[in-house]
C-alpha cells in the first residue's frame, strides 16, 4: 500500500540514522535539541528567523550559557549541523521539530502565533513523507487544533502523507541533574504511525521513550508537570507569609519538614519566573473554560505567585523603615535579575516587576547580573553594573533576586549595610548574619 510505503521509507531513514532533521527555533529548547540530534547521528538543519543567532552558530559562537562553545564547535566539525534563516531548507528534512516560543497575551490567553508561523513554513516548503514534532509547551489540543489544519491545507493528510506528534521538552535551564539521554521523553502522535516514528527518532537520543494515546495527552502531561510545581510553590509562599506574621523562620520549618522520609516533597518559597512555570497555569485554565470547567485552585495558586513581587517589595520597605531608611532617597542594589539562578534568561523574570515597584516608591535601583548585561523595565534600559565594593557599600540594601552560584555571598554580606535575601542564597554565610533579612 502507498500508506505503508511512505511510513516505511521514513522509518528506514530514521532507524539507520540517515534522516535529515530540521529544528525550527534555536533558543533554549531548540539549540540543545539540535546538538543532541547530531550526537544521535542525524544530519541537522537549524532554522531561526534571528539572523544574528544564525551567524553566531555558523561561526561556532554559542549565545546560551547552557551550550558551551566547544560543544557547538564539535557538532559543526562533524559537518552534520547547519544553520539558516531560509525556510526553503525545510524541503531537505525528513523530520521537523517545532521549538518556538509560546507566550500569552495581556489577557493571559495563549498566543500560538509562532507555532502557526512555523507550521505555515513547513506546509509551504515541506514535502510528503515528513514527520513533524511539536515541542513548544501549549494548551492540550494545540497540535491537532493549530498545527494539523495548517499542515493539511495543501492536501497532505496526517497519518497518510505526513506524520505529526507532540513531545514536550523537559529541560531545566541552569540545572542539569541528569544527562539528556537519561531524561525520558513522552510522545503522543495523531495516530499509530506518527507515534511509532516519533518514538523511533527519540530512541537514538534517550534511553526511555514513553508513548501516550494522543498529542493532547502529551500536552496535558507537560502542563501537569509544570502546574504541579506552580501550585506547590504557591503553597509554600503562603506558608512563608504566615510564618512572617508569626515570627517564625520558614526556612527552618522547611529544613525540618525535609527530614520526613516519605510523603513530603520540598519546595522553596520565592519569586516565580521564566517562560513555563508562571505561564502554564493560564494555558490550562483557558482551555478548561472551553469545557465549562473552572480551575479555581490552579488559578488561585497562580495569583499567589504573581503577587510575590508585591510581598517582597512591601517587606523590603518595612525593613528599610525599621532600619532608619524609607525617606524617599534610598538606593537598592539588586543582585541577579535572571528568572532563576545560573541562567542568562530574563523572560518573565519577577525581578522586572520588583524593580518597577521599587521605582514607583522613588527608590533608586542599580543591578548586577553577570548573565544579563542589559534589562528593560517599562521602556527604560538598565545596564548591569560591576559588582564592586562601591555598589555594595553605597546601597541602603542589597536585594538578592537570583542566587547565582558565582556570587561570593560572604563578601556581599561583609560589604553591604543590609541584605534582603529573597532566595536564601546566603544560607551558608556565618559572619554578619544580623545584616540579613530573608523571606
Which residues are covered by each model-predicted region?
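Structural/interface elements that position substrates and couple domains in central-metabolism enzymes
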Residues: 1-439
Amino acid at each position: 500500500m502507498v500508506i505503508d510505503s511512505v511510513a516505511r521509507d521514513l522509518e528506514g531513514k530514521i532507524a539507520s540514522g540517515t534522516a535529515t532533521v530540521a529544528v525550527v527555533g534555536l533558543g533554549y529548547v531548540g539549540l540543545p535539541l539540535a546538538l543532541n540530534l547530531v550526537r544521535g547521528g542525524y544530519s541537522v538543519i537549524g532554522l531561526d528567523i534571528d539572523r544574528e543567532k544564525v551567524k553566531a552558530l555558523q561561526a561556532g559562537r554559542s549565545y546560551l550559557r547552557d551550550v558551551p562553545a566547544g560543544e557547538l564547535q564539535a557538532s559543526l566539525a562533524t559537518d552534520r549541523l547547519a544553520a539558516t534563516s531560509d525556510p526553503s531548507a525545510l524541503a531537505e528534512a525528513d523530520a521537523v521539530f517545532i521549538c518556538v516560543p509560546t507566550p500569552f497575551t495581556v489577557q493571559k490567553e495563549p498566543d500560538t502565533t509562532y507555532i502557526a508561523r512555523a507550521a505555515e513554513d513547513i506546509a509551504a516548503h515541506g514535502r510528503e513523507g515528513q514527520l513533524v514534532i511539536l515541542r513548544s509547551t501549549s494548551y492540550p489540543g494545540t497540535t491537532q487544533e493549530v498545527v494539523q489544519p495548517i499542515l493539511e491545507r495543501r492536501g497532505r493528510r496526517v497519518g497518510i502523507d505526513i506524520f505529526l506528534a507532540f513531545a514536550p521538552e523537559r529541560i531545566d535551564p541552569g540545572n542539569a541533574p541528569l544527562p539528556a539521554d537519561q531524561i525520558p521523553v513522552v510522545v503522543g502522535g495523531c495516530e499509530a504511525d506518527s507515534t511509532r516514528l516519533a518514538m523511533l527518532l527519540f530512541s537514538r537520543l534517550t534511553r526511555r521513550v514513553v508513548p501516550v494515546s494522543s498529542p493532547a495527552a502529551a500536552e496535558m502531561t507537560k502542563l501537569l508537570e509544570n502546574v504541579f510545581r506552580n501550585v506547590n510553590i504557591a503553597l509554600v509562599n503562603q506558608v512563608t507569609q504566615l510564618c512572617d506574621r508569626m515570627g517564625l523562620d520558614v526556612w527552618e520549618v522547611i529544613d525540618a519538614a525535609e527530614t520526613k522520609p516519605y510523603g513530603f516533597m520540598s519546595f522553596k518559597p520565592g519569586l516565580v519566573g521564566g517562560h513555563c512555570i508562571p505561564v502554564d497555569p493560564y494555558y490550562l485554565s483557558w482551555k478548561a473554560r472551553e469545557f465549562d470547567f473552572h480551575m479555581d485552585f490552579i488559578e488561585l495558586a497562580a495569583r499567589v505567585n504573581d503577587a510575590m513581587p508585591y510581598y517582597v517589595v512591601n517587606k523590603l520597605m518595612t525593613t528599610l523603615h525599621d532600619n532608619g531608611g524609607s525617606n524617599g532617597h534610598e538606593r537598592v542594589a539588586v543582585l541577579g535579575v535572571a528568572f532563576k539562578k545560573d541562567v542568562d534568561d530574563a523572560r518573565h523574570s519577577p525581578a522586572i516587576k520588583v524593580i518597577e515597584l521599587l521605582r514607583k516608591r522613588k527608590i533608586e535601583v542599580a543591578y548586577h547580573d553577570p548573565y544579563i548585561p542589559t534589562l528593560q523595565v517599562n521602556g527604560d534600559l538598565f545596564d548591569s553594573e560591576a559588582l564592586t565594593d562601591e555598589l555594595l557599600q553605597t546601597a541602603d540594601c542589597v536585594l538578592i533576586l537570583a542566587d547565582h552560584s558565582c556570587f561570593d555571598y560572604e563578601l556581599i554580606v561583609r560589604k553591604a549595610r543590609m541584605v534582603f535575601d529573597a532566595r536564601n542564597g546566603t544560607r551558608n554565610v556565618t559572619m554578619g548574619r544580623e545584616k540579613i533579612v530573608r523571606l
